[in-house]
From Swiss-Prot:
This is Acetylglutamate kinase. It is found in: Cytoplasm. Substrate binds at residues 67-68, 89, 190. It is an enzyme of class 2 (transferase). Its EC number is 2.7.2.8. PANTHER family: N-ACETYLGLUTAMATE SYNTHASE, N-ACETYLGLUTAMATE SYNTHASE, MITOCHONDRIAL. Keywords: Amino-acid biosynthesis, Arginine biosynthesis, ATP-binding, Cytoplasm, Kinase, Nucleotide-binding, Transferase. The lineage of its organism: Bacteria, Bacillati, Actinomycetota, Actinomycetes, Bifidobacteriales. Belongs to the acetylglutamate kinase family. ArgB subfamily. The gene is argB. Its main location: cytoplasm.
Length: 305
C-alpha cells in the first residue's frame, strides 16, 4: 500500500496506538457491519482487513450484520413486492425465505471469505445456530395502533455459548441477524442487526460496541454538520431518543441497550471512511460519537481525555 508518510511518521502512528493496544488486549469488540461498508467493494476489503488486524494484535472481534440493500435487490430480482408500513418492511413468509437466504448464504459468506483470505479466522453463523438468539415478534405502533409487520422481531434473550467457543478457539464469529421465534422455534424472524449486536455485546461482556453507519455520528442539530457530538452520557442520549430521525434512532437505541447491559463504551461511526474502526479504536482523537455511562464520561472529563 502506497503512503506519503516518512518512516519516522509511520513509527509515530504505531506508537500512538500502543496505549490502546495495551488497554484492549484480550478484550471483545462487537462490530455491527452495515451501511455503505457492505456494498462498496473497497470498503468491504478495508472492513475485513480491520477485523483481521484486531484479531492479530490480540483483540477478539465479533461481527453482527444485516443486509437491507442486498435483501431489497434480491426481492426485486425475484419479483417479490416489498410493502412498507410506517417505514418498516413487512416481512411475509415468502420474503423471510429471501431474507434468510441473503443474510446467511450471501452476505455472511462474502464477508467470511474476505476475512479468510488472510487466514482461517472467520466462521459464519446465524442467530439460529446454537440457540444464540431468541426473538419475539414485533408489533410496532403506527398511527396510534399496534400493527402487524409480519416476521419481524426483537432479540429478547441470548445464549452466547457458541460464540464464546469460537472466540476461545481464536476465531472471528460473523453473525447473521435472524432468530427463532421465542413462541415457536420452528418460525424464524428477521431481527434488527443494531439491536442484536447490542444484546450480544452485553452477553459476551464486550468492552465496546461499534456500529457502522453512513453519517459521521450523532448530531445535536441535524443537518448542521458543526453539531456533531463526540461524547455523550447515556442518560442525555436516552432523553434525545424520541426526537431522533428514523434512521439514527435504532442505532442510538442499540447504544443505550448496550450501556444498560454493562458494555463500557458504544460508538456510532462513519463506515464510508476506509479503516474507520481502526481510527476509532487505536487513535487518541477517535471518530464518530461515543456513548458512555454518565459516571464514565465524568471520569474521562476530569482526566482531560
Amino acid at each position: 500500500m502506497h503512503t506519503d508518510l516518512r518512516a519516522d511518521q509511520k513509527a509515530e502512528v504505531l506508537i500512538e496506538a500502543l496505549p490502546w493496544l495495551e488497554e484492549f488486549a484480550g478484550q471483545r469488540i462487537v462490530v455491527k457491519y452495515g451501511g455503505n461498508a457492505m456494498v462498496d467493494d473497497h470498503l468491504k476489503q478495508c472492513f475485513a482487513e480491520d477485523m483481521v488486524f484486531l484479531r492479530q494484535v490480540g483483540l477478539h472481534p465479533i461481527v453482527v450484520h444485516g443486509g437491507g440493500p442486498q435483501i431489497s435487490h434480491m426481492l426485486k430480482a425475484l419479483g417479490i413486492k416489498s410493502e412498507f408500513k410506517g417505514g418498516l418492511r413487512v416481512t411475509t413468509p415468502e420474503a423471510m425465505d429471501v431474507v434468510r437466504m441473503v443474510l446467511t448464504g450471501k452476505v455472511s459468506r462474502e464477508l467470511v471469505g474476505l476475512i479468510n483470505a488472510h487466514g482461517p479466522l472467520a466462521v459464519g453463523m446465524s442467530g439460529e445456530d446454537g440457540g444464540l438468539f431468541s426473538a419475539m415478534q414485533r408489533r410496532p405502533v403506527i398511527d396510534g395502533k399496534p400493527t402487524d409487520i409480519g416476521l419481524v422481531g426483537d432479540v429478547v434473550s441470548v445464549d452466547a455459548s457458541a460464540v464464546e467457543d469460537l472466540v476461545a478457539a481464536g476465531r472471528i464469529p460473523v453473525v447473521s441477524s435472524v432468530a427463532p421465534n421465542e413462541e415457536d422455534a420452528t418460525e424464524v424472524l428477521n431481527v434488527n442487526a443494531d439491536s442484536a449486536a447490542a444484546a450480544l455485546a452485553a452477553a459476551v461482556g464486550a468492552h465496546k460496541l461499534v456500529i457502522l453507519t453512513d453519517v459521521d455520528g450523532l448530531y445535536a442539530d441535524w443537518p448542521d454538520k458543526n453539531s456533531l457530538i463526540g461524547r455523550i452520557g447515556v442518560e442525555n442520549l436516552r432523553d434525545m431518543l424520541p426526537d431522533l430521525e428514523s434512521g439514527m434512532r435504532p442505532k442510538m437505541e442499540a447504544c443505550v441497550r448496550a450501556i444498560d447491559g454493562g458494555v463500557p463504551q458504544a460508538h456510532v461511526i462513519d463506515g464510508r471512511k476506509p479503516h474507520s474502526i481502526l481510527n476509532e479504536i487505536f487513535t487518541s482523537a477517535g471518530i464518530g460519537t461515543m456513548v458512555m455511562p454518565d459516571e464514565g464520561l465524568e471520569m474521562r472529563s476530569s482526566y482531560g481525555y
